[in-house]
C-alpha cells in the first residue's frame, strides 16, 4: 500500500487547512478521488497548474490515488512557455484555478476545476507516477519521470529521519510544484498529518499570523528563505509551537547554518540541513541536528535506504577521506529518467537506482559529505534550479540578432550580452516575465563580444573577467 492510497485509520484526520478558513479531511480526499475515478481513467495524463491551495493539493493526491499521472506546472510560469509544455506532452486533462479556463468543467473541487484538454493521453510506462519540471520556470520541455516507488520510498525516508508523526503541522512555505515543497506534502500525508496551506509568503504579516493561529510545527526553506528570515528577525519571533526547521534547495552559507543551528539548539528546536535533486524525487541526504554545529557546511549523510560514493573521472570510487570527485547516489528514490516529449513517457527505468549528481563532493573522516562545486551548468535561484544554457536559449530565441552567455553562482546569475547598455533594462524585464526570476538575483551586462574558441564555443571561464 502506498501513502496516497486509502488508509481507514486516517479518514477522520484533517488533511489540509487553509488561510480562508477551509479544511479538508482524508475522507474528503478519498471521496473526491472516487468521484474523479468516474471521469478520468487510470493511466491517463493530467496537467495541474499548481498553487498552495486545498484544490490544487487535492488535485495532486486524487491523481496519485486514481493512478492518473500528474504533470505539475508552476502557476506563475509564462503562458507562452506553459502552452509549449502542454503541446509537447498532450495531457488529456488539466486541473486549474477557478476562472482561468473557458467552458464548463468536468468536475470541481474546492478552488479548482478539471477540464478535458485532449481527446486521449499519450502512452505511459506502467510504473510512471509523476512528472516534474527540472528548471523552475524556464519552460524547458525536459521533465523528470518518477515512479510510484520513487515517491513512496522518499516520503518514507524523510518521515523516518525527521521523526514525523500525525501530530505535525507544517506550513506551505514552498510551492507544491517544486520537488522540495511537494516532498513536505508527501512525507506528512504518509504519517496522517495535516498541512497548513497559504498563498502568503514569509514577507507577509499574514503568513506569520497564520502560523500562530494554526499552531504550525515546522517550516521548510531554501537558502534565500533563510536569508529572508534573518532579515525579518525570525529568531526573535514568538512561535511556541514551531519545533522543526528544514533547509534544502542549494548550499546554505556557513554563517546562516551556524546562526540557525545555534538558535535551534538554544530553544529546543531542530534545524536540519539537507541535500537533494528532483532526479532523486527530492532528498538524498540530511545533517542530523546533533551534528549541525559540529559539521558546518556539510550536507550530512545519505538518507535511510540510500548511499553515496565519490567517483573519479573514470567512475572509479575514491575511498580516501577528503578526495574530491563526482557525488554518486544509489537508492530507491532515484527517478526513472528524463522525458523530452510525450513519446518518452512510455520509457522504462533508465537509471536503475543510480544517479550521477553532477556535483563535486568529498567525504570527511567521519563519513560526512560536503559539496565542493558543480560539474554541470546550473545554479539555484531562490531555491529553483535554473539551467544557464536554457536561459541563454530563451534570450537567443527572442533576440536573434544579439549574443548571450550566462555564468555565476547561486542567487547570482550573470547574463552577458552584446546588446547595448540601453537595452539591458528591457532584457531584465524579459527574464523576469519569462523565467519568473527576481531582479535581485541576476545581473545583465553589456559587452562588445562574447569570447569564443576556434570552434565557436563560448569560453565561459573568460566571462567573469570581461570589462564593460
Language-model regions, residue ranges each:
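Conserved C-terminal "lid"/linker of ANL adenylate-forming enzymes
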Residues: 379, 407, 414, 429-468
Amino acid at each position: 500500500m502506498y501513502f496516497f492510497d486509502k488508509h481507514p485509520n486516517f479518514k477522520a484526520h484533517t488533511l489540509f487547512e487553509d488561510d480562508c478558513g477551509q479544511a479538508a479531511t482524508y475522507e474528503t480526499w478519498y471521496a473526491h478521488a472516487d468521484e474523479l475515478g468516474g471521469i478520468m481513467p487510470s493511466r491517463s495524463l493530467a496537467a495541474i497548474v499548481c498553487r498552495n491551495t486545498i484544490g490544487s493539493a487535492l488535485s495532486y493526491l486524487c491523481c496519485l490515488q486514481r493512478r492518473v499521472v500528474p504533470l505539475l506546472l508552476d502557476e506563475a510560469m509564462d503562458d507562452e512557455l506553459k502552452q509549449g509544455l502542454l503541446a509537447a506532452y498532450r495531457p488529456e486533462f488539466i486541473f486549474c484555478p477557478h476562472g482561468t479556463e473557458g467552458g464548463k468543467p468536468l468536475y470541481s473541487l474546492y478552488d479548482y476545476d478539471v477540464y478535458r484538454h485532449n481527446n486521449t493521453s499519450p502512452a505511459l510506462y506502467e510504473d510512471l507516477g509523476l512528472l516534474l519540471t527540472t528548471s523552475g520556470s524556464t519552460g524547458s520541455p525536459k521533465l523528470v519521470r518518477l515512479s510510484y516507488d520513487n515517491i513512496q520510498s522518499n516520503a518514507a525516508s524523510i518521515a523516518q529521519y525527521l521523526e514525523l508523526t500525525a501530530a505535525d503541522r507544517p506550513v506551505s512555505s514552498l510551492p507544491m510544484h517544486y520537488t522540495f515543497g511537494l516532498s513536505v506534502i508527501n512525507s506528512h500525508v504518509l504519517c496522517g498529518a495535516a498541512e497548513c496551506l497559504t498563498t502568503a509568503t514569509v514577507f507577509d504579516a499574514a503568513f506569520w499570523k497564520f502560523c500562530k493561529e494554526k499552531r504550525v510545527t515546522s517550516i521548510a526553506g531554501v537558502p534565500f528563505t533563510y536569508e529572508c528570515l534573518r532579515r525579518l528577525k525570525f529568531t526573535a519571533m514568538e512561535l511556541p509551537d514551531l519545533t522543526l526547521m528544514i533547509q534544502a534547495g542549494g548550499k546554505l552559507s556557513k554563517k546562516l547554518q551556524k546562526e540557525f543551528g545555534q538558535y535551534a539548539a538554544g530553544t529546543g528546536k531542530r534545524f536540519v540541513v539537507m541535500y537533494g535533486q528532483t532526479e532523486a524525487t527530492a532528498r538524498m541526504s540530511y545533517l542530523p541536528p546533533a551534528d549541525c554545529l559540529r559539521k558546518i557546511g556539510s550536507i550530512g549523510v545519505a538518507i535511510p535506504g540510500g548511499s553515496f560514493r565519490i567517483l573519479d573521472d573514470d567512475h572509479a570510487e575514491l575511498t580516501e577521506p577528503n578526495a574530491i570527485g563526482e557525488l554518486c547516489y544509489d537508492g530507491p528514490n532515484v527517478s526513472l529518467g528524463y522525458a523530452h516529449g510525450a513519446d518518452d513517457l512510455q520509457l522504462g527505468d533508465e537509471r536503475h537506482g543510480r544517479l550521477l549528481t553532477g556535483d563535486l563532493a568529498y567525504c570527511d573522516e567521519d563519513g560526512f559529505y560536503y559539496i565542493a562545486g558543480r560539474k554541470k551548468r546550473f545554479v539555484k535561484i531562490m531555491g529553483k534550479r535554473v539551467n544557464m544554457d536554457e536561459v541563454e536559449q530563451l534570450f537567443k530565441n527572442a533576440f536573434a540578432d544579439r549574443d548571450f552567455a550566462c555564468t555565476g553562482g547561486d542567487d547570482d546569475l550573470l547574463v552577458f550580452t552584446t546588446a547595448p547598455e540601453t537595452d539591458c533594462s528591457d532584457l531584465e524585464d524579459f527574464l523576469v516575465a519569462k523565467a519568473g526570476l527576481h531582479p535581485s538575483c541576476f545581473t545583465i551586462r553589456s559587452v562588445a563580444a562574447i569570447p569564443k574558441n576556434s570552434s565557436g564555443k563560448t569560453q565561459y571561464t573568460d566571462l567573469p573577467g570581461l570589462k564593460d
